[in-house]
Amino acid sequence: MSDEAKEKRELESQKESSHNKSEKSVEPKPKRRRRRNYDDYDAEVAKEETKAKNGLTKSENNGTVEDSESDMDDAKLDALMGNEGEEEEDDLAEIDTSNIITSGRRTRGKVIDYKKTAEELDKKEPSTGSKDDVGYGEKEEDDEDEEDDDFKE
């Protein structure tokens, strides 16, 4: 038996080595990863930075002029923001009050008289009782009274 086990181990090792050789000979080609070319973008950013630096040196000399321009820009933005708020308030005035649902149920535009529908349902199925009926509650109370009488002995 030990001879058979040794032979099996030898065969297994041979299979593994042949399998490894086949893997080595047929290596999958490594996937090429393409690097994005940011060189053009970097050049544009560098140009903008140099312009900004040049603009800063000029703006330091003309600081008062730039401050007044920024104040004007702020005023324009405030005016625009104020106009947007007024438009929203105007939209609220255009809402028709007849479209507002006063009851608690949504009916997707249909006007439903719930009292009439309840009466129609009662006419169609008068034998069906609901949990809200008085008779339903009385049956439960009677059962409880009977149980209590048994325990009072």
From Swiss-Prot:
Q: Which residue stretches does the UniProt record annotate as biased composition, category Basic and acidic residues? A: 1-29, 110-138
Name the source organism.
Saccharomyces cerevisiae (strain ATCC 204508 / S288c) (Baker's yeast)
The Polar residues compositionally biased stretches are 56-65
Q: Which positions carry N-acetylserine?
A: S2
Q: Which domain of life is it from?
A: Eukaryota
Span list, region Disordered: 1-153
A GO biological process held by the record: chromatin remodeling
Q: What is this protein's record name? A: Histone H2A.Z-specific chaperone CHZ1
Phosphoserine sites (modified residues): S68, S70
Indicate the quaternary assembly.
Forms a heterotrimer with H2A.Z-H2B, stabilizing the association of the histone dimer. Also, with a lower affinity, forms a heterotrimer with H2A-H2B.
Q: Which UniProt keywords apply?
A: Acetylation, Chaperone, Nucleus, Phosphoprotein
- Principal subcellular localization: nucleus
The UniProt entry's sequence similarity note says: Belongs to the CHZ1 family.
Any extra detail in the entry?
Present with 623 molecules/cell in log phase SD medium.
Residue span of region Important for H2A.Z-H2B binding: 87-108
Could you state a single Gene Ontology molecular function term?
Answer: histone binding
Acidic residues biased stretches? 84-94, 139-153
Query: What exactly does this protein do?
Result: Forms a chaperone-bound H2A.Z-H2B complex that acts as a source for SWR1 complex-dependent H2A to H2A.Z histone replacement in chromatin.
Annotated Gene Ontology cellular components are:
nucleus
Please state where this protein is localized: Nucleus
Q: Which SMART domains match?
A: CHZ (SM01082)
